[in-house]
Amino acid sequence: MKKEAKICLNAMVGNEEHCIERMLKSCYEYIDYWVIQCNGNDKTQSIIEDFFKDKDIPGFTYNHEWDYPGINRDHTLQTALNAEHGCDWILRMDADEQLEVDDDFDWSPINDTNFECFNITARSAGSIYYRTWFWNAKLAWYFEHDRRHETVHLRGGAQHNAFNLAPGFRHVITNDGVTWEDPNKFLVDAVELEKTQVAGGKLLEDPYHFWYIGKSYYDAVNLGDYPLGMTHTKEYARRSIFYFENYLDRVHNYKNIEEPFVNEMIYMSLYCIGEMYRKSKEFEKAISFFVEAEDWCPRRNESIVGLAECYNELGDYETMKMQTERLVDPQRTIPFPELYFLVNTNFYIDSGGYGKYLHSIACKNS
């Protein structure tokens, strides 16, 4: 089935002249209207207007000063919702993304305008997950005015039901937009989240952002340039562990759960704690958390990679090989879309080569 419903592209862009046309070229064949907020000072706005003029697709740009992500995303979403575009759906995209649609993609879910919204597959370097960036244009959506990790909702407190679109319709994220120019982006995210959630008294009522404080410090350990070097890294790892452990206890009452069950949030929390201990060279603790994590999501490989990396650093190649043999098992394929929370594509035999790389090290040295 081919596309029948009409789609409005919605975006918010800064100084993106280096990548904006790539995004537009990827999606123009699938859209019927566009509403794009511009808050930069380079040629991005004129590139957008010239591009769509050439393609004869109606829409408009508008200027709005930059405040912070939640406010600006909500402003551009409200502008799209209130525009006279006649579209059924609003598709959100960032400037450093591309839309990929397989030739055999089944458009029937999108043609059914009874759905409230869709979860779209998002792929970045080494990661795949779902995000709710495709909304029914007839409903009253809004972005919460979050400073980081903005969340989208229906007005009136109604819970929305998202349909998982097949991976044949996906966003590909290249992380080369203007927001990625700051090497300490994730540290800034963590501090901003602490300011609003901890100092603002919201932490215990908002488990989503509670988790992302820990994740932002985790990412700050993996990507950042700090004046105190490893001293800073260990401190941010400590903070990540602190938030993940308290998230598990406060949100999941983790210490009182008698039997594990499949839960990706618990799995990723334990895995990230293990990674922070590994980065801090506390291998015994790291191994313990990686083993514990696997109980909560046996199909996922991230914790197995963590174990292999620990044994590699310890020089225990025989034990490392026991783990890497699992990573190259042809049965341990990527579990997406059945499991979909920040799945690392590098760690599965059918989607990446890191497991084979670790296995070659183990075989060579054992």
Describe the function of each predicted region.
Residues N10-Y33:
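Short, well-formed alpha-helical segments that are part of the catalytic scaffolds
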Residues E49-H75:
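Conserved donor nucleotide-binding strand/loop of the catalytic core
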Residues Q197-D206, N246-I266, T333-Y348:
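Flexible helix-coil transition and linker loops at the boundaries of alpha-helical arrays
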Residues I36-F52, E65-W66, D94-A95:
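A conserved acidic beta->alpha catalytic loop
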Residues G70-L77, E84, E97-E235, R239-F242, ...:
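Catalytic-site signature of metal-activated, phosphate-bearing donor transferases
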Residues I90:
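Short aromatic/hydrophobic "clamp" motif used to bind/position activated sugar donors
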